[in-house]
C-alpha cells in the first residue's frame, strides 16, 4: 500500500506542476502590473498560491512536491516519503475528501479529541477515526473550497 500511496502523491505533484505550466501573463488595466492566469485541470492553483504564499515566478516540480506534502499535513516531501503506511493512507484520504473537511479543521478535530481524552493518537487511530466519521457518515461539508478540482 505504501508504494501505491507514494506514487499517488508523485502523480499529484506532477499534475500540480502541469497546472502551473498553463500560466499566461497578463497586464492588469488598473495597476499596470504583470500577473498570471492559469487554465488548471487538476488544482485550484490560484488559491493554492495565495493560501500557501508561494512564488509564482520560481515554481518547480520539487516545489510542487513540497506543496503537495504541505497540503496533506507533512512539513516537507521527504517526511511524506518516510511516513508510515497509515499516515500515507490518511493523507490520501484528506486530499481526496477536502470537500468534507479541510486539513486545518481535521488537525483541530484531532487535537480536540486528544485534549479531551488526554491521549496522543497514533496514525492507525487517526485513520480509523477519519474513515468512521468522514467516510461512513454523510453530511460533512467543509466551508472551504477544495484545492483539488473535481475530475469529470
Task: Tell where the protein language model's regions lie, with residue ranges.
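Long, non-globular segments of proteins
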Residues: 1-152
Amino acid at each position: 500500500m505504501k508504494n501505491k500511496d507514494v506514487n499517488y502523491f508523485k502523480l499529484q505533484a506532477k499534475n500540480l506542476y502541469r497546472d502551473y505550466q498553463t500560466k499566461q501573463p497578463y497586464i492588469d488595466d488598473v495597476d499596470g502590473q504583470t500577473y498570471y492566469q492559469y487554465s488548471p485541470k487538476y488544482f485550484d492553483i490560484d488559491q493554492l498560491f495565495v493560501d500557501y504564499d508561494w512564488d509564482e515566478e520560481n515554481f518547480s516540480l520539487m516545489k510542487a512536491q513540497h506543496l503537495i506534502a504541505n497540503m496533506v499535513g507533512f512539513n516537507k516531501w521527504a517526511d511524506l516519503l518516510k511516513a508510515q503506511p497509515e499516515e500515507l493512507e490518511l493523507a490520501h484520504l484528506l486530499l481526496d475528501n477536502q470537500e468534507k473537511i479541510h486539513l486545518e479543521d481535521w488537525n483541530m478535530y484531532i487535537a480536540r479529541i486528544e485534549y479531551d481524552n488526554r491521549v496522543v493518537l497514533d496514525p492507525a487511530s487517526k485513520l480509523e477515526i477519519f474513515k468512521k466519521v468522514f467516510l461512513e457518515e454523510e453530511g460533512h461539508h467543509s466551508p472551504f473550497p477544495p484545492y483539488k478540482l473535481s475530475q469529470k
